[in-house]
A protein has these predicted regions:
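Glycine-rich active-site loops that engage anionic ligands at enzyme catalytic sites
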Residues: 1-239
Length: 239
């Protein structure tokens, strides 16, 4: 049974569970779609996460009890593929200077580097939420044998567009940032672009993606094309 929590006088959170789970996250997305379809005046932001949906609102425009009732009704929305979701195919160059932790991950899991790369590229990962940094996608779930703790000493600066894993999750850093996840590779794809006013973040919660291994030469070629504005975000959409 979903649980409704108040966050001060300007937000409500609807909780569906207490763990990372694709089924729970699908219910979150279904509730989001159902609520947004109501077009309630007074809502300023709708924030889906792994297991909950938080709605920020203006109590002078939208009655709290009315919003609470709408949220509980939205919690029962049928599960279906959201019209807002997209599927992506993201190129990544693995290992070497681009993925300095690939060898460590291979050793820790008892696999070869090639086997780790093949396993990552064989997964279809779900975007559970966007957080931490603008455009930063939390992806899951990884198979159990790839669940590794975060680094004991985080890096002060993780290169932008780095693909990393920690625990049951994978992620891509859209910006240079401190970080304690294991770096496996890097993508030439731009994950956040303010020039795209309609959708500055490439990914959205509920999207899915796969990775494709590329060479360092292909990475350089694609990164150059992206920087020159020759490749739009639609280029990375899966067929």
């Amino acid at each position: 049974m979903p649980r409704l929590l108040a966050l001060g006088d300007g937000a409500l959170t609807l909780e569906f569970g207490d763990r990372i789970d694709a089924g729970i996250n699908a219910r979150v997305m279904a509730a989001r779609d159902a609520l947004e379809a109501r077009h309630l005046v007074g809502i300023s932001d709708v924030v889906p996460t792994w297991r909950s949906l938080t709605v920020h609102f203006d109590p002078l425009q939208l009655d709290r009890d009315r919003l609470a009732a709408c949220l509980m009704q939205s919690a029962d929305a049928p599960l279906q593929e959201s019209a807002l979701t997209a599927r992506w195919q993201i190129p990544v160059v693995f290992g070497g200077e681009f993925g300095p932790d690939l060898g460590t991950v291979a050793s820790a899991t008892g696999r070869s580097e090639d086997a780790v790369v093949a396993a990552i590229c064989d997964l279809e990962l779900r975007v559970f939420l966007i957080g931490f940094l603008p455009g930063f996608p939390y992806l899951g779930e990884l198979p159990g044998w790839l669940h590794l703790p975060r680094l004991k000493t985080p890096r002060a600066a993780v290169p932008a567009n780095s693909l990393a894993i920690a625990g049951a999750q994978a992620a891509i850093y859209p910006w240079v940032s401190p970080g304690g996840w294991h770096l496996l590779g890097r993508t030439p794809v731009r994950l956040f672009d303010l020039a795209d006013a309609a959708r500055p973040a490439l990914f959205a919660p509920g999207d899915s993606l796969r990775f494709t291994a590329i060479s360092s030469a292909d990475y350089t070629r694609l990164a150059t094309a992206v920087a020159a504005g020759e490749l739009e975000s639609s280029h990375w959409r899966a067929p």
